[in-house]
UniProtKB/Swiss-Prot annotation:
EC nos: 5.2.1.8
Ranges that cross the membrane: none
Domain PPIase FKBP-type: 163-248
Protein name (database record): Trigger factor
Length: 437
């Protein structure tokens, strides 16, 4: 048997194998003999059909069986002898198997790249300086009050103002022809919120109950109905009712509706604590992504396409799960599976690169995980909930593979922490960070 191993790229090898004719003949004979024993052909007792008839009837089955055995006995033996570890099923190309002729085939095998970390300390990155803005808490409280507002009918001869909630009938027409898909009755609109068309809402200001008017607008190119998107047309609007929002008072009674709070000050304190933690977590996650990207840029690495494909499919499934939990679909987001795959391919490639580089760093620095660190991770995941803590422990001790996944996650966090501790970090103000983005 002749074997040739060729390196195609850092992540792929081509294995070419030629099996001599005498070995091919031997396997063909043995296979036909086996088929002859079990073949059931009309007019012949089992095992008594002539060999020539067996060959004519079962030639394709013979070829499939012989080639399968050759792959099993020669390909995997060759891979083992040359210490080639495939990370996906090999892609095989072969000649036609014929008696009296050597059988040649080749297998393209994807392998893990050799990861050489040339620079992983002194990585230069930026970090957003956290600055607490109390106004964000007040803005959130204002949104909470707005969400609990009561709608009170406006009495008397009153015209629509910004902020009013109005009930309207409207019908849209283009060039005098009605578009039923862009019409509604008793639609509720918050004037000035611009949840519909700003140009449309602004022209409602000044209308009074019972009044009708024409409102001319140009629909945006991205309008939900493609048949009228980008066209100029007219709405015939009839105003049925005007209501105003009556906000609840900002007092202790208001605060008590949001959990175990006795006063507005307690509510503010908890919201401030949550906001600060949320912002710090966000900055930490951004730092993590930034330092991994810096690691990728300093350590170029080819990655197997099969790993990228798996990462893309995982990202697609994660998105579908999130959309399903919100009763949404890919179509509602204006995309399909293929367009999403194309959109995330580059980021999926970087995720694979980053993962391989972190694995190499973990091995190089010999990071380990203690039982105490595992317990701390359990507690972090439980968030102080004792019942949840027990369920988490039960889950991660249910099998060695599940426990291993947690240990791998902790090791990866340690590797990222190592990168950050040894990086050159320049702090920037939030405004500068936003401008760079």
């Amino acid at each position: 048997m002749q074997v040739n191993v060729e390196t195609i790229s850092p992540v792929s090898k081509k294995v070419s194998i030629e099996i001599p004719a005498d070995q091919v003949n031997s396997e063909i004979e043995k296979t036909y003999a086996t088929i002859q024993k079990r073949a059931k052909i009309q007019g012949f007792r089992p095992g008594k059909a002539p060999l020539q008839l067996i060959k004519r009837t079962y030639a394709d089955s013979m070829r499939d069986e012989v080639m399968r055995r050759f792959y099993e006995t020669t390909l995997f033996k060759t891979l083992a002898e040359h210490k080639i570890e495939p990370i996906d099923a090999p892609t095989v190309e072969c000649d036609i198997l014929e008696e009296g002729t050597p059988f040649k085939y080749s297998a393209l095998v994807e392998v893990m790249p050799e990861v050489l970390l040339t620079q992983y300390t002194g990585l230069e990155i930026t970090k957003e300086r956290y600055v607490f803005d109390p106004q964000k808490i007040e803005d959130e409280i204002a949104r909470m009050r707005d969400g609990m507002a009561q709608l009170v009918p406006v009495e008397g001869d009153v015209a629509v103002e910004m902020g009013h909630m109005v009930t309207i009938d409207y019908a849209f027409s283009v060039d005098g022809f009605p578009e039923e898909s862009t019409s509604a009755e008793n639609a509720v609109v918050e004037v000035g919120a611009h949840r519909l068309l700003p140009e449309f809402e602004d022209q409602l200001v000044g209308m009074k109950c019972g009044e009708s008017k024409h409102v001319t607008v140009t629909l945006p190119e991205a309008y939900r109905n493609p048949e009228v998107a980008g066209k100029e047309g007219a709405f015939m609007v009839t105003l049925n009712e005007i209501k105003r929002k009556e906000l609840p008072e900002l007092n202790d009674e208001f605060a008590q509706q949001f959990g175990e709070f006795e006063t507005v000050e307690q509510l503010r304190e908890k919201m401030t604590e949550y906001h600060q933690q949320h912002e710090q977590d966000r900055i930490e996650q951004e730092q993590r992504e930034t330092v991994i990207q810096a690691l990728i840029e300093k350590n170029p690495l080819d990655v197997p396409q099969s790993m990228v494909k798996r990462q893309v499919e995982q990202m697609l499934q994660n998105l579908k799960n999130r959309l399903k939990s919100r009763n949404m679909s890919m179509e509602m987001m204006g995309m399909d599976d293929d367009s999403f795959r194309e959109r995330v391919r580059d980021s999926a490639t970087d995720k694979v690169r980053g993962g391989l580089l972190l694995m190499a760093l973990i091995e190089k620095e010999d990071f380990s995980v203690s039982d105490e660190e595992i317990e701390k991770r359990y507690e972090k995941l439980a968030g102080g909930n004792e019942e949840m803590l027990e369920r988490i422990k039960e889950h991660y001790t249910s099998s060695p593979s599940v426990r291993h996944s947690l240990i791998a996650e902790i090791k990866e966090d340690k590797a990222v922490r190592f990168l950050l501790d040894n990086a050159v970090i320049t702090e920037t103000d939030p405004a500068e960070t936003a401008a760079e983005a």
